[in-house]
Regions:
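N-lobe entry segment of adenylate-forming
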Residues: 1-23, 27, 51, 86-87, ...
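Conserved S/T- and glycine-rich ATP-binding loop of Class I adenylate-forming
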Residues: 31, 48, 79, 139, ...
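Conserved AMP-binding A3 loop
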Residues: 3-7, 140-164
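Conserved pre-ATP/AMP-binding loop-to-beta segment of ANL
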Residues: 104, 110, 122-144, 151, ...
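Structural core segment of the AMP-binding/adenylate-forming
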Residues: 22-23, 46, 50-120
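Conserved AMP-binding/adenylate-forming core of the ANL superfamily
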Residues: 1-46, 63-68, 116, 120, ...
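Conserved AMP-binding/adenylation subdomain of ANL enzymes
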Residues: 163-183, 187-220
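Conserved coil-to-alpha-helix start sites within the AMP-binding
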Residues: 35-46, 61-65, 185-202
Length: 220
């Protein structure tokens, strides 16, 4: 069991925010994020939010053609994945002219920026004067629908969306600071936003992350 404090989360997301700015990624640039249930998912999502970069979470079930569709549909400038999807991204890169930056979490690979390397090189504080200003109505997240009857559709969420989930935490989940909250969803589904991310963080609850392979009835 590895424990991370709220202070750890803030500092780690600050490092990634600084890394984004150092790379030249700007406010309004879409970033494809396909990560499992690991702490780095939080660092990336919050770092994007702090810099105005538009995170596009994707489920870990996505294949190369699905990644290509999402990158091209949103004109994504950045892809942040693990080795599980690195080869698929490389396979479709030539078809994605807007894709300029590749970030690999948990490993090193030729042609990729290692997440750990770019973050450790940055400060764990952000200079508020250099951070882009974001407004409540500006785009913060893009989710894609499941595409049951046609191609997946983009669904945008603005910066006010996060604060709106205080209602989710208070009146639906009844979250308290003393609670330990566990949501099993994949990080690419919208449920992750209101199960893994905003309500428990707003409430100050502890969040349990477990990234086992598949669903084990005895364990879960």
């Amino acid at each position: 069991v590895i424990h991370h404090s709220y202070s750890d989360l803030d500092k780690a997301s600050n490092r990634f925010a600084n890394a984004l700015m150092a790379m030249g990624v700007e406010k309004g640039d879409p970033a494809l994020v396909v990560l499992p249930r690991i702490p780095e998912w939080y660092h990336v999502l919050l770092g994007c939010c702090k810099t105005g970069v538009i995170a596009m979470p994707g489920t870990n079930l996505l294949k190369a053609k699905d990644l290509e569709y999402r990158i091209k549909r949103a004109d994504a400038k950045l892809a942040i994945v693990t080795t599980a999807h690195a080869e698929a991204v490389e396979e479709i890169m030539a078809n994605c002219p807007t894709l300029e930056h590749l970030v690999l979490v948990g490993d090193e690979r030729e042609g990729w920026s290692a997440f750990e390397t770019i973050c450790v090189a940055e400060r764990d504080e952000v200079d508020r004067a250099t951070l882009p200003t974001t407004r409540a109505e500006e785009l913060m997240l893009i989710y894609f629908t499941s595409g049951t009857t046609a191609n997946p559709k983009m669904v945008g969420r603005d910066h006010a969306y996060a604060f709106a989930h205080s209602i989710t935490g208070d009146y639906w989940m009844d979250l308290k600071e003393s609670d330990v909250h566990w949501t099993l969803t994949d990080t690419g589904w919208a449920k992750a936003a209101w199960g893994l991310l905003y309500p428990p963080l707003i409430a100050g609850s502890a969040i349990l992350l477990y990234d086992g392979e598949g669903f084990d009835l005895d364990m879960h």
